[in-house]
């Protein structure tokens, strides 16, 4: 043993606790000195020595018909600092009261030492009956390892679990694979989550265990080395599995050393500490990102190889009653029972461009899979490539052809990524494989996100997308050639992790790719522009005032034409949806639809003059009046005009006809001082909070503090002041998950806002610490946008999205006598990116001195 514990005799819980702590200290101090396998072996030896000595001291060793057997992870000698001690006490018959007392004493002692114990006491007959009913028990028994007591009794258990009538090889295989399917579904079939589980995520240790269990049930192979010697895996597969297993073991061991309670999730705070223990260096996030890149690559290799071997077992080892049906596809490929097979094992080595044809055939035969033997030949060939596939002219032609095939992304590009073909084709791809960004915004690694963007684009073809993404569905369905958009998606983030502007660098990469693949100058320019500008629409829609004609003109000038607008819209929507499933909601849909509509109008009108919103205002007035005349018989045109005469022109542009009609119906005969109404019916994409009252100090502060205290997300705020000093304030809110607000919650918020606005006191800031936010730092940035407007100032604020931030900002505005006209609230993971339109107390734009004072106060208070 590396560390020899001093186990006193007789054993005492306090002495064992001291030795456990000494062992942990030894492991912390020597973590980088010894291999992870030595550390795990050493810990297992310590447990064995402890349990065997305890067994003897309690005099259980003197009982002839009883055996102590390690099972589960302890049985396979896979023990980490916080692993459970799983063991079976195998008895010949129901224990006598005396033996039962000794067994209780044995288990109680381990509990007193602080161990988490997973124990069972069974007869051989009980092992058989319970094991037959429960695959988990059967699996535990399969990994049984003798520790002490009656050896023949243990041997009898071993013989039992090998019998075909206990669990047949086929039934055992199918049950374990079904467990894996259900586990993958719990993790959304991806290993690339922000805070992954080392054990249970796809590609995690459970995938390795599945491989062990199948091999153990089939041939009795106890270790990865034994599986190699049996010929079931190739040497290169063994090497990759061994390296990946070692890395996951190191991460899990380090995680257990820093925790006090058992857990296998790599939460954000733990990622930082584990990366330090593993020796990853770098200021701030890079160390974590380097470690997680290695981690995700290990998961990918384990998932790929273990699933390939499971498929190999099903296809080549398990019996099949299926008649063989062979379709010859060409000289090199054939379809055998819907499995793509090579007719010659050396096809890929001799003609590497034919690798792309394998995936072409996947798109042509929607029910086909790739045979495991073909996949193994593919892996061998990829390892032997002397150049990137894109350097082969025939491969380039085949690669471009794939984009126009049915279900090209799902059937070709997803498998190409899974099996390493994209890495073999694109020089830049390997750098983004497993690359994560240590933030709350990007929940997938860059490579996984990229494929999800492409898959989302492909989904726009389905009729199901017409409701959720009507504009993208219409555009994408009408494109005669979708190749350019797919290529733009493939490259939009390809330069991440290099330093510098990834959009600028990616534009260079995609231009080189397009030129190499023979695209014309127009296509090259379009692709380079799309990658360089892929964030433009997102920034404009979410962080600019899209009702400002200058904003629309600037955006239209950058986009240049309707074709590019269509491309950019599809790419932007797909990018947002594939970044984080919670980001897209009905509010964002309406926001992007408005920008798309305004920009289209600008193109139709021409680029010489700003978009004329008077036409939009008149149109909205007309439609709102039609709604009022249709739905509210007691409202007269005269009363409508009297109310509308108080409102600035801006009001009729920034609100939809439904909103205007709703506001009007509420106010046309309203004579009281305060009105708060909340509805889901009239605002596109969110729940609207409408407030009418006389303007008052701290109004915005009171509203956002109250909304925040009730745990809603604010997406947009409009402050319209009438000519007689009243405000028409509209806030678009949702639940934190992006859903509309239900009736009871709306009534509750109405009451809270009414009380807050009637009170002279400011609401107390409700600050609930966020576990995830504690581990991130965001550099506060205050930026004033350059514009020539004298009537207002536009400001961007980037800061950590801590609780009460918006209320804190609004309080600063009040203290500096600033008026807020409009706000857009955007949360990007842990980061708030907010946009405000302000005036000073005289209703004018802020001068340079006022801007500098505001900047300094924000920095000082927000940090």
UniProtKB/Swiss-Prot annotation:
Residues 329-687 are annotated as: Uridylyl-removing. GO terms for biological process: regulation of nitrogen utilization. It catalyses: [protein-PII]-L-tyrosine + UTP = [protein-PII]-uridylyl-L-tyrosine + diphosphate; [protein-PII]-uridylyl-L-tyrosine + H2O = [protein-PII]-L-tyrosine + UMP + H(+). Residues 1-328 are annotated as: Uridylyltransferase. Disulfide bonds: none annotated. Uridylyltransferase (UTase) activity is inhibited by glutamine, while glutamine activates uridylyl-removing (UR) activity. This is Bifunctional uridylyltransferase/uridylyl-removing enzyme. It comes from Haemophilus influenzae (strain 86-028NP). The lineage of its organism: Bacteria, Pseudomonadati, Pseudomonadota, Gammaproteobacteria, Pasteurellales.
């Amino acid at each position: 043993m590396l560390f020899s514990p001093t186990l006193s005799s007789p054993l005492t819980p306090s002495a064992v606790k001291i030795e456990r702590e000494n062992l942990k200290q030894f492991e912390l101090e020597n973590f980088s000195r010894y291999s992870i396998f030595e550390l795990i072996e050493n810990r297992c030896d310590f447990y064995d020595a402890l349990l065997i000595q305890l067994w003897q001291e309690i005099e259980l060793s003197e009982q002839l018909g009883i055996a102590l057997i390690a099972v589960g992870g302890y049985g396979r000698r896979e023990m980490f600092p916080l692993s459970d001690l799983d063991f079976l006490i195998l008895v010949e018959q129901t224990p006598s009261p005396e033996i039962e007392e000794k067994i209780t004493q044995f288990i109680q002692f381990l509990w007193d030492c602080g161990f988490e114990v997973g124990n069972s006491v069974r007869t051989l007959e009980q092992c058989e009956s319970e094991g037959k009913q429960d695959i988990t028990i059967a699996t535990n028994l399969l990994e049984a390892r003798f520790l002490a007591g009656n050896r023949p009794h243990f041997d009898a258990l071993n013989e039992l679990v090998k019998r075909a009538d206990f669990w047949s090889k086929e039934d055992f295989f199918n049950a374990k694979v079904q467990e894996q399917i259900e586990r993958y579904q719990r993790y959304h079939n991806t290993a690339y989550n922000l805070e992954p589980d080392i054990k249970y995520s796809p590609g995690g240790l459970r995938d390795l265990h599945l491989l062990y269990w199948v091999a153990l049930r089939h041939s009795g192979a106890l270790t990865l080395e034994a599986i190699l010697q049996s010929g079931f895996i190739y040497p290169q597969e063994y090497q990759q599995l061994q390296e990946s297993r070692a890395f996951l073991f190191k991460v899990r061991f380090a995680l257990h050393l820093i925790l006090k309670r058992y857990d296998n999730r790599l939460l954000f705070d733990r990622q930082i500490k584990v990366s330090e223990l593993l020796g990853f260096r770098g200021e701030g996030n890079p160390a974590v990102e380097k470690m997680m890149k290695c981690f995700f690559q290990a998961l990918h290799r384990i998932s790929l190889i273990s699933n390939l071997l499971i498929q190999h077992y099903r296809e080549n080892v398990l019996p099949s009653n299926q008649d063989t049906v062979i379709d010859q596809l060409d000289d090199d490929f054939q379809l055998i029972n819907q499995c793509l097979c090579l007719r010659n094992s050396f096809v890929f080595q001799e003609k590497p461009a034919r690798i792309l044809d394998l995936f072409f055939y996947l798109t042509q035969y929607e029910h086909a899979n790739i045979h495991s033997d073909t996949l193994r030949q593919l892996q061998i060939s990829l390892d032997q490539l002397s150049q990137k596939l894109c350097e082969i002219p025939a491969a380039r032609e085949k690669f471009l052809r794939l984009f126009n095939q049915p279900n090209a992304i799902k059937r070709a590009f997803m498998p190409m990524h899974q099996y390493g073909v994209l890495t073999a084709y694109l020089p830049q791809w390997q750098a983004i494989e497993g690359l994560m960004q240590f933030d709350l915004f990007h929940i997938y690694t860059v490579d996984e996100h990229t494929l999800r963007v492409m898959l989302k684009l492909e989904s726009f073809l389905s009729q199901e997308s017409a409701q959720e993404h009507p504009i993208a569905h219409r555009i994408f369905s009408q494109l005669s050639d979708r190749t350019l958009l797919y290529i733009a998606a493939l490259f939009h983030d390809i330069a991440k992790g290099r330093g510098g502007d990834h959009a600028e660098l990616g534009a260079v990469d995609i231009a080189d790719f397009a030129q190499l693949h023979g695209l014309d100058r127009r296509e090259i320019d379009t692709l380079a522009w799309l990658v360089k500008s892929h964030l433009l629409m997102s920034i404009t829609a979410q962080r600019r005032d899209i009702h400002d004609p200058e904003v629309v003109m600037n955006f239209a000038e950058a986009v240049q034409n309707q074709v590019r607008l269509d491309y950019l819209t599809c790419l932007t929507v797909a990018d947002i949806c594939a970044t984080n499933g919670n980001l897209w909601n009905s509010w964002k849909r309406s926001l992007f639809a408005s920008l798309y509509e305004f920009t289209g109008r600008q193109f139709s009108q021409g680029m010489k003059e700003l978009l004329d919103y008077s036409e939009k205002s008149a149109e909205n007035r007309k439609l709102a009046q039609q709604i009022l005349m249709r739905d509210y018989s007691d409202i007269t045109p005269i009363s409508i005009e009297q109310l509308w005469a108080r409102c600035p022109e801006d009001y009729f542009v920034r609100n939809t006809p439904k909103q205007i009609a709703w506001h009007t119906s509420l106010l046309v005969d309203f004579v009281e001082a305060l009105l708060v109404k909340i509805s889901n019916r009239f605002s596109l994409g969110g729940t609207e909070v409408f407030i009418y009252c006389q303007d008052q100090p701290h109004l915005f502060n009171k509203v956002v503090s109250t909304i925040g205290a009730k745990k809603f997300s604010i997406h947009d705020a409009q402050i319209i002041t009438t000519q007689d000093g009243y405000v028409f304030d509209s806030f678009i809110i949702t639940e934190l998950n992006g859903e509309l607000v239900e009736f009871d919650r709306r009534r509750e918020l109405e009451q809270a806002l009414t009380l807050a606005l009637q009170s002279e006191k400011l609401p107390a800031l409700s600050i609930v610490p966020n576990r995830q936010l504690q581990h991130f730092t965001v550099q506060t940035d205050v930026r004033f946008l350059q514009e020539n407007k004298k009537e207002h100032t536009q400001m961007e604020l980037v800061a950590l999205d801590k609780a009460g931030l918006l209320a804190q900002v609004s309080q600063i505005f009040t203290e500096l006598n600033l008026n807020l006209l409009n706000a857009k609230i955007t949360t990007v993971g842990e980061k708030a990116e907010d946009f405000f339109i302000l005036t000073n107390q005289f209703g004018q734009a802020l001068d340079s001195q006022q801007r500098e004072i505001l900047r300094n106060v924000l920095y000082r208070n927000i940090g």
